C-alpha cells in the first residue's frame, strides 16, 4: 500500500525533538523607548493645555496676549507633532 504524503511529512518533523519546537524565539524588535512615549504624550497634553489656557485666560496673561493668533499655531503645532510621533510608536 502506498504511503500518503501527510505521513511522510510527519516523519520528517518527528525527527526533531519536541523541546526544540517549544523554545520561545526572541524577536529583535525592542519596541519604543519609554522616553519616546512620554515625550509624545507630553507634547499632545501641552498643546491641549496651551489651547485651553489661551481660550480661558489668554487676554489676561501678558505674553499670551502679545502672541495673539500665534497661540493657535503653537497649540496645534504641539498637538500635531505629538500625533505624528504616534506613527513611530511600536
Curated annotation (Swiss-Prot):
GO terms for cellular component: plasma membrane
An individual GO BP term: cell division
Membrane topology term: Multi-pass membrane protein
Region listing for Disordered, in residue ranges: 1-27
Pfam families, A to Z: CrgA (PF06781)
TM region positions: 37-57, 69-89
Family: Belongs to the CrgA family.
Protein name: Cell division protein CrgA
Record organism: Corynebacterium jeikeium (strain K411)
Amino acid at each position: 500500500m502506498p504511503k500518503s504524503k501527510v505521513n511522510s511529512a510527519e516523519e520528517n518533523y518527528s525527527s526533531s525533538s519536541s523541546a526544540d519546537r517549544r523554545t520561545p524565539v526572541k524577536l529583535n524588535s525592542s519596541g519604543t523607548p519609554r522616553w519616546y512615549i512620554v515625550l509624545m504624550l507630553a507634547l499632545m497634553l501641552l498643546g491641549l493645555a496651551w489651547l485651553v489656557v489661551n481660550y480661558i485666560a489668554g487676554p489676561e496673561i501678558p505674553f499670551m496676549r502679545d502672541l495673539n493668533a500665534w497661540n493657535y499655531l503653537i497649540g496645534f503645532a504641539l498637538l500635531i507633532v505629538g500625533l505624528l510621533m504616534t506613527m513611530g510608536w511600536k
